[in-house]
C-alpha cells in the first residue's frame, strides 16, 4: 500500500471571507479551487509546512496555525489533507495558482472546489 502523503490546507478567514486559490491546470484537480497549502516535508510540522507553503505560493506571512479542524483522505490518491485555521498577514498574490480570491462562506460552494475542499466547505457551512 502506498505511503500516505500529509498535506496541510490553510483555512484563512478575514472579515467573514475565506481565501481560496485556483489550482494550476497541469496539476491534479487542475483548474479547481482549494484552500491553499501543500505537502509536508519529512519531519515537518503542520505549522512549518503552512508557513513555508503560504510564503512560497502567496507571499503571505503566517502568524498562527490553529489545531486541525478536519483531516480527510483525498479520493483516489494517497494524500491525507488536514485543514487548519490559519491567521496570516499580507495581501495574497497568486504565484503558483491561476487565481486567489476572498469568498464569503455562503459562496464557497458556488466555486468548483477540489473534492476534499468541497467536503470541508460543507462541514464549514454546517457549523
Task: Pin down the residues of each PLM region.
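Conserved N-terminal beta-strand and adjoining loop/helix that marks the start
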Residues: 1-19, 39, 70
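Conserved hydrophobic "DFG−1" position in protein kinase catalytic cores
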Residues: 12-13, 20, 86, 102
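HhH-family (HhH-GPD) DNA N-glycosylase catalytic core used in base-excision repair
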Residues: 51, 55, 60-65, 127
Amino acid at each position: 500500500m502506498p505511503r500516505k502523503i500529509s498535506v496541510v490546507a490553510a483555512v484563512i478567514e478575514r472579515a467573514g471571507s475565506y481565501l481560496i486559490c485556483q489550482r494550476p491546470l497541469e496539476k491534479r484537480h487542475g483548474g479547481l479551487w482549494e484552500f491553499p497549502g501543500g505537502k509536508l516535508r519529512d519531519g515537518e510540522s503542520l505549522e512549518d509546512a503552512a508557513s513555508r507553503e503560504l510564503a512560497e505560493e502567496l507571499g503571505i506571512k503566517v502568524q498562527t496555525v490553529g489545531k486541525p479542524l478536519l483531516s480527510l483522505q483525498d479520493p483516489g490518491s494517497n494524500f491525507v489533507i488536514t485543514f487548519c485555521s490559519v491567521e496570516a498577514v499580507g495581501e495574497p498574490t497568486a504565484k503558483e495558482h491561476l487565481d486567489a480570491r476572498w469568498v464569503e462562506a455562503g459562496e464557497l460552494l458556488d466555486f468548483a472546489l477540489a473534492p476534499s475542499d468541497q467536503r470541508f466547505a460543507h462541514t464549514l457551512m454546517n457549523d
